Amino acid sequence: MPRHRSGPAPSAARHSVRVPATTRGRVLAGLGMAAAVVFFLTTVPFHRNWFDLHVYYGAVEHWTGGDPIYDYLRPGTHYGFTYPPFAALCMLPMTLVDWHSALAVSQLMNVAAAAVILHVCLDSVIRRESRHRWFAYTAAACMLALLEPVRDTVSFGQVNLLLLALVLADCRLLTAGRARFPSLGRLAGLGIGLAAAIKLTPAIFICYLLITRRWRAAGVAIGTASGATLLAAWAAPTASRTFWTEAMWNTDRVGSLAYVSNQSWQGMLARLTEPFAEPSRAVWAVGVVLLLWLWARRARQAVAAGDELAGFALTGAAACLVSPVTWVHHLVWLIPALAVLADKGLRADPGGRRRRRLLTWALVSYAVLCSSMVWLWRWNDGGAPGFLGANAYVWMALFLLLLLPLGEPGADRGGPYAQSGPYAQSGPSATMGLCAHATASPSPSVPVSWLSEQPASPTRPGSKPAPSGSAG
């Protein structure tokens, strides 16, 4: 099948960011960007010293030595293994190598996961916007590495990038997979199921498949998650019983809910009431119900508009908000939303207000998520301004859930990510982007309400401390 392009070939006359004209210049610029990022990452005073990877490594060694895995605590702390038993089975190979080898493999897996994330989020926009794909990917990789959730995931030795890559692989299969690789398209849901079996948070993406009527993919995801969980129950019955009946419900294992790193709705409530009282469970529950209602409504709109990446982005934002514990490194789930913002801005009418607003919002959101600003109020003592600043990432996730633009009026519907789901009869193809180095290809624009827009006439058929925290 021939490969389609979304819009005309990029034009040098429309580039909004100049790139070096020669190959040598681009190579030098790419090396310069990479060197600057490496220098920053090796000197910034927020490295987490592989804390969570130490927990994983120590826990599986403790387990293979004959002791209960959920009894393990890292020496000098009260933090232990908090993941389901299937995750422990996946980590067993670490016991075959020494610590430094395990660390090296962990970082290589993070690099591979980042490559998948960049490809799913950026491939179509880079094809549309840039003549120099490798240079655009280099710049995007440098930008990705500077995000605080990515920095924390890497320096904690966390698994969040791997989980996001698994989930986004299903996003790709739900769009391009079915059109270009039908046999692979039938595997959609496999990545979400594996991610949900490793960690509970990605299970919300199974709900996303259900509310958007992707029955086959939802069945694959549920079957995969259930099969992995049953495999763990067969291989480690005692650990499975302990996790599902005790460890999962013990919130003391993950740290203080009021700690500033907990950037969830529950964390915000806990900081609001600390130290005078516990946050109201009723208020938390009402907020969660409202957030889930809003998410379900907007996710259906995204799929009706053929905008699969936006649907996944909304689900990631909702996951960050409704989870009782959303440490800063969990906020990698907001990366697809940044991609959608940038791509929609680049597609908007050049010189128009909507373009400026969307690109400004994307840049401000990116800067905030790089800034580590919440740590300025880590002791929750800044009054009203401190409350606003300490919850900066909560506000960001909420704004993205409320206002993320959906669909693309006038976009080419035959591109590499064309939607083939239940709402594919109307709405433009999904477009993906996080950063680009040129203005968008011209496309018709329609009046919209500030930033967000409704899909076009869809036709539907029928506490975790900074240097040391829980391995959560």
Per-region residue spans from a language model:
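Intrinsically disordered, low-complexity terminal tails and inter-domain linkers enriched
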Residues: 4-16, 130-132, 176-184, 348-353, ...
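Hydrophobic transmembrane alpha-helices
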Residues: 98, 199-202, 337
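Primarily membrane-embedded glycan-assembly and transfer machineries that use lipid-linked glycans
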Residues: 2-186, 212-328, 344, 385, ...
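Hydrophobic/aromatic-rich transmembrane helices and adjacent perimembrane loops
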Residues: 328-343, 394
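Transmembrane helices and adjacent periplasmic/lumenal helix-loop junctions
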Residues: 192-209, 323-330
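Aromatic-enriched
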Residues: 342-417, 430-438, 447-453, 469-472
